[in-house]
Amino acid sequence: MDKPDYAYDTFLRHFNSSGLNDKDNGFTMLELGPGDSIASGVIAHCFGAKKSYLVDKGSDAIASSQNYGLLFDYLNKKFECVDFPKSSDIVKPVEEITDKWNIEYMVDGLDSLKKLEDSSVDYLWSQSVLEHIRKPEFT
């Protein structure tokens, strides 16, 4: 994740259209097709997400937490009360990040969606992914 401002702006654009700005008790977010990053789950945490699902067709997300240092530094400057480490202090495996902020990275494509309980997601979004799903895969 070498462009934290792009990740943030993309998340914010979708979030602002979701109607969840005033949700007091947190929300559950799902991004379909996060690509090579868990950034949207990290950013959702800043906006009060209690759970984030990141669903993709394969395990393409960068596995080293050190690669998220730029994102953490960006968010630490943007928000006053976030609990992110400084990029120079990051030595954790990415699983510690996903566990700490309740981010579930699911890599079985549409089969991952079938594992979710009905009505368990408040906010679902996708950035340039839906056009890659073939119609027969929806059935």
Language-model segments: residues:
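A short, conserved alpha-helix within the catalytic core of class I
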Residues: 133-139
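Active-site and donor-binding regions of nucleotide-sugar-utilizing enzymes
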Residues: 10, 27, 38-42
